[in-house]
């Protein structure tokens, strides 16, 4: 699979993911993981999922029971335009992301290829960057720190200790 993050990882196909036990069902949970059994000079084998179907107006919900934490991990759940080679044209929305445990909370973001800004947001988090242009702020886009009502429990060890959480997004292309 394509490595859009340019990280030290080898994304494997479905047969290899099954063979290496990197993705599987466990009761009501779907597990995705990285191979921790061997060191690889080009990065550890892991999985990356993408939808075969595209969505426009929609509600997307992710219930997560556990996120990996620590140095050299970059767990994320995001949406991107179906024209990925033209990124950031069409945009990207990061619903759940935090690389290398840099922050104690989840970081949501929007990346677009035009001038766009977050103004007067109705949110419980804190606006870290208000410019959504994908090339501004070291490619951070508009970034919101999810540190509002349940500070610290939106990411990492605190999220895992409370048994996980839910991230949801309504995508609506109508004006307003």
Please tell me what each predicted stretch does.
Residues 46-48, 153-155, 164:
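Eukaryotic intrinsically disordered and solvent-exposed regulatory patches
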Residues 161-176:
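Localized edge beta-strand/strand-to-loop motifs within extracellular or lumenal beta-rich domains
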Residues 1-101, 105-109, 118:
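Low-complexity, Ser/Thr/Pro/Gly-rich disordered linker/stalk regions
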Residues 41-42, 152-153, 169:
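Mixed-charge, polar/low-complexity N-terminal
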Residues 54, 69, 85, 150-151, ...:
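Short, glycine/acidic-rich beta->alpha junctions
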Residues 88-160:
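Glycine-aromatic-enriched beta-strand/loop faces of beta-sandwich-type recognition domains
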């Amino acid at each position: 699979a394509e490595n859009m993050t340019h990280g030290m990882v080898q994304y494997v196909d479905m047969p290899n993911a099954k063979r290496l036990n990197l993705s599987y069902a466990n009761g009501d949970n779907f597990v995705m993981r990285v191979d921790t059994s061997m060191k690889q000079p080009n990065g550890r084998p892991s999985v990356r999922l993408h939808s075969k179907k595209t969505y426009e107006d929609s509600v997307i919900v992710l219930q997560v029971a556990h996120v990996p934490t620590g140095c050299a991990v970059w767990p994320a759940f995001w949406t991107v335009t179906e024209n990925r080679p033209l990124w950031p044209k069409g945009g990207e929305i990061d619903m759940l992301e935090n690389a290398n445990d840099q922050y104690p909370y989840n970081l949501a973001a929007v990346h677009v290829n035009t001038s766009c800004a977050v103004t007067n947001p109705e949110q419980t988090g804190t606006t870290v960057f208000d410019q959504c242009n994908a090339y501004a702020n070291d490619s951070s886009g508009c970034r919101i720190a999810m540190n509002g009502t349940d500070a610290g429990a939106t990411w990492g060890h605190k999220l895992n200790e409370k048994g996980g959480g839910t991230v949801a997004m309504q995508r609506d292309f109508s004006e307003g």
